[in-house]
Regions:
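Aromatic-lined carbohydrate-recognition surfaces of secreted/lumenal glycan-active proteins
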Residues: 1-43, 82-92
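C-terminal beta-strand-rich structural cap/linker in extracellular carbohydrate-active enzymes
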Residues: 252-289
């Protein structure tokens, strides 16, 4: 273990000597969260994180169970200063949108491996049902879950400034209590400042970011968000540009404090909270598993 960590540290330092800014990451592919490895109890993932040449550690989870993934992300996020990236997870998981939303809602990130798997490997393996990891087919055709995965990524990208800095207690993620989204669902989640009731009849996922004086709201499909515990004002649609400025693309109206959200549209709602609330955002991730 000492030999391995010394080697990682040396390589990391060498790379960081580059003339451009470099962030170094090590992927860990086996273990129980950040607990010591069963085969060598003196070896821990945090040993790698503590190396001067390594900036953060991620996990190659290869899990499609939301609760199991939640446990991994929370474990890696518990290391102060670490970015809890799911460094690799199969693109062939049908619930990829739910897995991605889970990771981001808990303060982590998510990489799909891979975009498409070569047909050569699919045809030349003893386990053909295990080798195709692509979010697309080998000939770059969409799989059934490719469009909702793309839609979720676009929503997170549109809100990227706040996705990067919001705390998990203020990232409300809807319809991820199970491994697959419910077709019909009414779900109430509280952030530290807002109470939100989400309704869908089309298996939509959704999220709300509570930024204290405004909310960012997004859903994959047309959905409703009832907003309570505050005064809610101007509502616009748009996205953050490359300079980090929210660019207005349209307007919307709240009806009885309810936003009838169009799928694939990011909304910004100005608000002031009535009183502090106890957040239950984390409890509403994988809670039925």
């Amino acid at each position: 273990w000492t030999m391995i960590t010394n080697a990682l540290n040396t390589v990391g330092k060498a790379v960081k000597n580059s003339s451009y800014k470099v962030v170094t990451r090590v992927n860990l592919i086996y273990g129980d969260g950040i607990n010591p490895f069963p085969e060598a109890t003196n070896a821990r993932p945090k040993d790698v994180f503590d190396l001067q040449g390594i900036d953060f550690i991620g996990v190659d989870a290869y899990k499609d169970n939301i609760k199991h993934l939640k446990n991994e992300v929370m474990a890696y996020a518990s290391i102060a200063g670490n970015y809890a990236l799911v460094a690799e997870n199969k693109g062939s998981y049908a619930n990829s949108p739910s897995l991605i939303l889970t990771s981001f809602a808990l303060g982590g990130g998510y990489d799909i491996y891979d975009l498409a798997t070569s047909n050569f490997f699919i045809n030349n393996t003893t386990e053909p049902d295990q080798i195709d990891h692509g979010i697309y087919t080998w000939d770059l055709q969409e799989k059934e879950f490719t469009p909702p995965t793309r839609s979720l990524i676009k929503g997170l990208a549109a809100a990227y400034i706040d996705v990067a800095k919001v705390k998990p207690e203020n990232f409300a993620a809807f319809n991820i209590n199970d491994n697959q989204p419910k077709d019909k669902l009414e779900q109430l989640i509280c952030t530290t400042g807002a109470q939100i009731t989400f309704q869908t009849n089309n298996a939509s996922l959704g999220f709300v970011l509570d930024m204290h004086n405004y909310l960012l709201i997004y859903s994959l499909n047309d959905s409703q968000f009832k907003l309570e515990n505050g005064k809610f004002g101007e509502t616009i649609s748009g996205r953050y540009d490359v300079n980090g400025t929210f660019t207005k693309e349209g307007t919307a109206t709240l009806e009885n404090q309810t936003l009838h959200a169009k799928g694939g549209v990011l909304y910004k709602v100005n608000y002031s909270s009535q009183q502090s609330l106890t957040s239950n955002t984390i409890e509403n991730i994988g809670n039925n598993l």
